[in-house]
Amino acid sequence: MTFARLALRTALTATVLAALPGLAAAQMSHQHTSEAACEEALLRCATKVTPAFGPDGTLWLAWMAGGRISVASSKDQGKSFSTSVQVTEPQLDLDWGPDARPKIAVDARGGIALAFSIFRDKAFNGQVLITRSTDGGRSFAPPKPITANNASQRFEAIGFDPAGTVFAAWLDKRNRAPAQQNGQTYDGAALFFATSRDGGETYSDARIVADNTCECCRLGLAFDGNGHPVVAFRNIFEGGVRDHAIVTFADLGSPGEVHRVSRDDWQIAACPHHGPSLTISPEGTYHVTWYTNGKARKGLFYAQSRDGGKTFTDPLPVGQVNRGPSRPQIIAGPDGLAMVWKEFDGTKTSVNLMTSHDDGATWSKPRAIADTNDASDHPLLVSDGRQTYLSWMTKADGYHFQAIEAEP
């Protein structure tokens, strides 16, 4: 593996799952066939790794490996990690969908909230489980469902608002069966949410934001300058068009109007398995990146909104179309905006970077900052308030944690 201006690299190695079975043909994925993954619950066996920083600068990782969720921490920006803690003891049928991964968030006092999904049957009906740690990650409460409803739930997103309340959103199919029983068609799932004011121990009753969302794409979650949740998601618009939408909450319990991010006109009766990424800058600008294969445009795109998500700029193409750009991530960090995504040149997968220092008005030229010759997880971005980092799990080269450096 080659890292341009490599800042940090762990000595840990990993095995990442090969191409996942049963994915829709529409999915853009760079996971290629290889030998079976190892079955241990160690980071080197992880298929998905999610980072989060605590208020003291501690880096936390949550990962899937061996049918279990595990957590470890680093006090030296990823150079070394603590002994891992298994959040789940028995092996579970964890949601291995391309956009599924454990979610971890840390509050101002160091409390940890964690959520993940499992499959409950062979029809891929899911269940969102939640847990928390109140002792600095040394132990976690037994996982339990986020809602008592037994309909399928997947693709959760969680985060702490500035006051320390956990906000959780997920895709939920509870309204599908009643609609069909009444002779009505019901496409996709619904966007639901709940909140926890005790650090993730208990959650409020689930409430709906919108029906007929795409059922298989991750959510983008951020908080605006007022501490209100903002959720980006792939919606199902009239005619079966699966384009992206966004909703801003007036408070933790009051979702606002759903607005369209872009008119890509991707009409597809299948699962794209490719959700958006959302960040909100200190200026209050919404920044969204996404993938589409629509009639109006194809590939990765970026747009911004300066009116609270009501309207967005014309989509800006991202990446080289002939290299299948995929899995975009964007973050508003201390040095401005950073955006990463994956490309595949026929031999290797690279992580590419663009940065902006004027709130998205202009962007640097794309440059590759990492590559690998085998399967890999999505590239993720995380910030400790002083530095932005790339977090990337690879099969051949292990887990890597790399500082995003300024343009040369």
Locate predicted features.
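Extracellular, repeat-based ectodomains that mediate carbohydrate processing or recognition
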Residues: 27-408
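N-terminal secretory signal peptides that target proteins for export/translocation
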Residues: 1-6
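Bacterial N-terminal signal peptides
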Residues: 9-22
